[in-house]
Amino acid sequence: ATSASRTQRSTKLSHAPFQLPNYSNTFSGVCLVNFFNLWYNTKKEWRRTMKHTALITGASRGIGAALACRFAAEGYHLALCCHNSYETLQALATKLETTCSIQVLCFRGDVGDYTFICDMVQKTLDTFGQIDVLINNAGISYIGLLTDMDITDWNQIVATNLTSVFSTCRQVIPSMVHAKSGHIINISSVWGNVGASCEVAYSACKGGINSLTRALGKELAPSNIQVNAIACGVIDTDMNRCFSEEERSALIEEIPAGRMGSPEEVASLAYSLATASSYLNGQILTLDGGWI
């Protein structure tokens, strides 16, 4: 054969498609096909039934309870905590387990206590294997002049509102980094953006949460973890029911939307953040009806 014909033959051989032997009519081939189909269908069913997990602090009432209801309705297993109103939290958990076919863990403790946070996160991971969404919602307020505060009041507000966010993030992040996936949503306030007279400590904590959110979003973005915050305006919760009807009416008049926000609206936005594009990161989303 000439050199040209050898080259032509070689070219044809190199482009011939590779074909697997046909084992479909053999016993081993049938077993292999059946095994593959079983594996594929089992994996498909496992993916269909696999639920995500959300850990929500301050979940017994108000925004926290609305968050729990929304994520439960979307099929999330839940880990919920509160400091007071534990019976209310348990009743909520029972209701959600029954109506949404999910599992709920309830914890009672002070989110300002680092040991409590460590135990809660570990038990949640032991039970569910992962925490897909962390929502830092727990918070307390102090209304009064700064000069009337003592150091105990200040430390308690900072521990509950700000240090707790560090604590939960510190404990949850390693598992999210390992999974290369996760959402951290911090419930903040417009007072963190502009400050409020007679709520200095609360404003300082919320401002700290906003800065933490922006910085941590940058830090965790390479690990495909999104960190965002919701800066709430006036939401109709127990925290704002200290106002008289006259004060509430005057406050509502200042809000372009003409009403207070609802806890369910906060929960809806939080769920949107938990399912948003990974490119949305380190942002503070204001939910205030156009108020600030």
Language-model features, listed with the residues they occupy:
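Conserved glycine-rich cofactor-binding loop
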Residues: 60-61
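Substrate-binding pocket helix/loop in short-chain dehydrogenase/reductase
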Residues: 145-146, 153-158, 247, 251
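Alpha-helical segment proximal to the catalytic Tyr-Lys
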Residues: 174, 218-222
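Short, small/polar-rich loop/turn modules that mediate ligand/substrate recognition or access, typified
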Residues: 221, 226, 280-282
